[in-house]
Regions:
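Extreme N-terminal cap/leader segments of soluble proteins
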Residues: 8-71, 90, 99, 122, ...
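Residues at secondary-structure transition points
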Residues: 39, 70-74, 78, 110, ...
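Small-aliphatic-rich amphipathic alpha-helix that forms the alpha element of a beta-alpha
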Residues: 72-96, 117-125
């Protein structure tokens, strides 16, 4: 597929899944280096008898949370949970996370400390290590990106494509 056609398709107003489908088509011909291609909540890299499972999600202020309606601790905890739940749903045990924060001046200091307390609470509860990330300033909204990493036996991966009604995760 030609790049211009893909760019046009990606700029049209679409559902999340049709947009992801366009991205998968655009990048599908590139090498995956052992990772499973786009199409599930996580990607999987099989390493012998073990699988490394990775997921990422973004949370944007006024889209995924309202600063006035949720405490900073709640937002921190939720940010981790939405990611490690994807890893767990694939049959893996969450083990590590990367956290990137873009904070306006109004969220630096007390709000950021509360956020980190909530994020820490989730990490401590589920035995997840924070192993890296990034911080930057933003103009007026909070943007949060979390990468969750988990491990599982290669033969225990639960894929959305194989899910059946009544399955228990």
């Amino acid at each position: 597929m030609h790049f211009r056609k893909i760019v046009y398709l990606c700029t049209m107003k679409k559902t999340e899944f049709s947009f992801i489908g366009d991205i998968a088509k655009m990048f599908g011909s590139l090498p995956h280096h052992g990772f499973e291609p786009i199409g599930d909540d996580c990607t999987v890299l099989n390493i012998g008898d073990e699988a490394l499972v990775l997921s990422t999600d973004m949370l944007i202020e006024d889209v995924h949370f309202l600063r006035g309606a949720s405490s900073a601790e709640e937002v921190g905890y939720k940010s981790l949970m939405v990611n490690i739940s994807d890893v767990a749903a694939m049959g893996a045990t969450p083990t590590a996370t990367l956290l990137s924060l873009s904070l306006p001046e109004s969220a630096q200091g007390e709000w950021a400390e509360g956020f980190m307390r909530g994020f820490y609470e989730g990490c401590a509860k589920y035995g997840v290590a924070l192993v890296g990330g990034d911080t930057t300033a933003s103009r007026d909204k909070i943007a949060i990106n979390v990468v969750a990493i988990g491990r599982a036996p290669s033969d225990n991966i639960k894929r959305r494509s194989a899910a059946q009604v009544g399955d228990i995760i």
